[in-house]
């Protein structure tokens, strides 16, 4: 069983658990390794020698923080931190990984996969340096043209092989990703060369006053992930009985499409 999660724009610059890499190829064992080396070198090259306007566009900012820029410029030598701690946006604040019991942290290290827009698919405990790249923003240097969606396309086979390597018959996935990352890696497009008897995908929606919420959904995805970890959820069917403060499961809709069974869970946000 896997839980798929989005990264966050906001990242931790300094952390007491960060440590210096012993070698530059910290990404050697990453799942998405096709084209990663040249992409990172191009990324660093632009930050070190590119125009200020180009860097602002890559970062998605009006003003560049020099400390953050310096860390990203020296990405290969910057201190490393587990991905689940590097990201500190709304969803990760709700998850509050550091204050979970050790068993819950172990659960996430085993089941959580984070879709980075630069490094590709990351395990929760994969160590990454500080970096910045606005969602959906690409870059080009020399012969290298980086685009997040194209990068995932190159690594699709690697990702599927990783997802199914520990599965026996069916594959269960809780998809907590934002729409952009769902498009980067489409669960409905299973390569015909891979043997999967059934793919079971659970996908939550959050509504308030009858309307689907978008921004607040980040927070509640983090809450849902936290509760899965605290309860050590082994089977996604158990989501139907999982209690979450502030949320009420309103409906579960099943959509069958060939080998894919998609279960859409609609949670109502209760007024305080």
Regions found by a protein language model. Give the residues of each.
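Extreme N-terminal starter segment of soluble prokaryotic enzymes
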Residues: 1-3
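Active-site helix-to-loop segments that bind/position phosphate- or nucleotide-bearing substrates
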Residues: 5-99
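Internal, well-folded beta-alpha domain core
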Residues: 97-272
């Amino acid at each position: 069983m896997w839980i798929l999660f989005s990264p966050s724009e906001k990242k931790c610059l300094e952390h007491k658990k960060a440590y210096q890499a012993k070698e530059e190829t910290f990404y050697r064992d990453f799942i998405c390794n096709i084209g990663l080396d040249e992409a990172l070198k191009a990324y660093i090259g632009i930050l070190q020698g590119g125009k200020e306007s180009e860097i602002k566009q890559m970062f998605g900012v009006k003003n560049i923080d020099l400390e953050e820029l310096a860390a990203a410029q020296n990405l290969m030598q910057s201190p490393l931190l587990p991905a689940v701690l590097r990201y500190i946006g709304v969803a990760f604040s709700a998850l509050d990984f550091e204050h979970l019991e050790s068993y819950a942290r172990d659960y996430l290290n085993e089941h959580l996969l984070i879709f980075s827009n630069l490094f590709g698919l990351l395990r929760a405990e994969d160590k990454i340096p500080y970096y910045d790249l606005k969602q959906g923003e690409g870059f080009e240097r020399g012969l290298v043209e980086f685009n997040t969606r194209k990068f995932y396309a190159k690594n699709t086979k690697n990702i599927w092989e990783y997802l199914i390597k520990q599965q026996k018959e069916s594959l269960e996935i809780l998809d907590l990703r934002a729409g952009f990352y769902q498009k980067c890696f489409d669960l409905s497009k299973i390569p015909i060369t891979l043997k999967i008897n059934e793919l079971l995908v659970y996908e939550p929606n959050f509504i308030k006053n009858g309307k689907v919420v978008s921004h607040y959904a980040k927070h509640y995805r983090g809450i849902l992930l936290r509760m899965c970890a605290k309860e050590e959820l082994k089977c996604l069917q158990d989501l139907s009985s999982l209690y979450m403060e502030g949320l009420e499961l309103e409906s579960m809709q099943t959509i069958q499409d060939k080998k894919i069974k998609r279960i859409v869970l609609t949670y109502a946000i209760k007024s305080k």
